[in-house]
């Protein structure tokens, strides 16, 4: 479908869509008010699981990627039950430590290739397949958004105590969102591995975490399409800017994150922000009031109408 694009452009587009999947993985937990910094760790789990199955066990590509996503989801479920009882900064630090444990473990095990990573991964995922997966995930998100699960997650985000008082099992839905986030991050890791053909622990760095977190904060937690479009827009803009240095990218995204948190803390898809912008655009312009054309009529008298 995208054969008219040159190989480099297809590779860049695939990387942007992988980032979109990672942003969606954060969008899931944002729905219930959870700030998870373990996304990169789950991405590494999915990438290494699928790559090892393909290179060592000779699994086909699609089952290997699916298995990697499932392993990441299982790990998210297990460890999510341990850290999701935390709140605020403690939850953020707990999930960050969890993600770093996964990455450091991968870097130090010999059967994962150690610091050198894994090479020789089959490169047989097309850009069209990745586009289809992102759209399919979006359709699922829309269905969940309209379901009771989506309403429960949003209720938890607004006020946990009120949600619990309404009969919503807060712990269960937070764990469900964390598990789904791990699945999407593992899926993104698998697709990236089969797009580049090589992976190493250095890919899952703090700089990448800052980039994905910045994209997620810019998009906000209200519209899944906003997450995808933000990832695409920033990715395309980055290509035009031509920034390739990791430190420069980290500074760029970090500064962007600070600006967004100050100006639009709820993201650009915040309904209140959109309503204000729409109201200002549609509100009619009122010029200076014109002086009355006739004197007020006496009490009880009808005004004079001139035709």
Give the residues covered by each predicted segment:
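Transmembrane alpha-helices and adjacent helix-loop boundaries
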Residues: 1-307
